[in-house]
Structures are given as structure tokens and as C-alpha cells.
């Protein structure tokens, strides 16, 4: 069941309708003819059942919003604190807890393990034809590195060198 566009809409609804909200919703960050939105989000976590094409959660559920843009995250955080609830697919959902994970960037070389909370989609498009890749395809690593570098440049986030390897 696909609900990602609903969650994306919920996140955008937390932004003000002024220049800031307009920037995040309509403009985004640019680099080399590419446009990047400033955030990503996870799937919904929690126990649920599907009834009439709707997710029915048995208890609490949660999801993650992630961004390099602190201003974006602070705006989302303040809006949630003020409202104490979200409107998700015409359902009022009470917020019980909100936390900010302070993941500091690091300098130098460091081995880290990244687990994606949502599937990665790796593809290239040429002449209106898209080619999709599996993480095990040798081209995937270059696409991932280039994507990270392009996003860092679009966000004006400094990187000197990006060493990246996929272990299976």
C-alpha cells in the first residue's frame, strides 16, 4: 500500500505558507540543473492491519523525518509543538512524543554502517528511457556517490572526499 505521498503532504502542511514554505515546497536546492528537496522520510512503523484500502494502526506509530537543513527541521518541530497533532488523510492524529536525533557530522575518515529506512531507487534516464539498477550492480555505487556529492553541493555542505563502499 502506497502512502508516501500522504506523508509527504503532511510534512509540507507543517510548513508555513510564506516564503520559507514556498521555498521548500516549490523551489528546493539546485545544483547542475538538478533540484533537490531538503528532506526525506521513512515508512510508518507500528502494528497495523489493512481494511478497505486503509491502514488501521492497533496502537502508536511513528516515522522519521531527516534533513541537513536545520532551519527546516526547527520549523517542523515548532509547528508540531504548537499544534500537538497532525492531520493525516483526514484523520486527526495526536502527537505523544517528538524527538530530535542529534547526529553530528564527522571530519576525516570514519567507517559507518548506514541502514536505509526506505528502499533506495537507483536509476538513470537517457532519451526518455529509464534503466533501473540493483544495489549489487557495479554502476550503483557511482550513482550513489554522485547523488550524495550533488546533494552536498546543492546544500552548500562541505565535503573534501567521499569514500563509499557497499558491503552485502
Go through each PLM region and give its residues.
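RNA-interacting cores
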Residues: 1-168
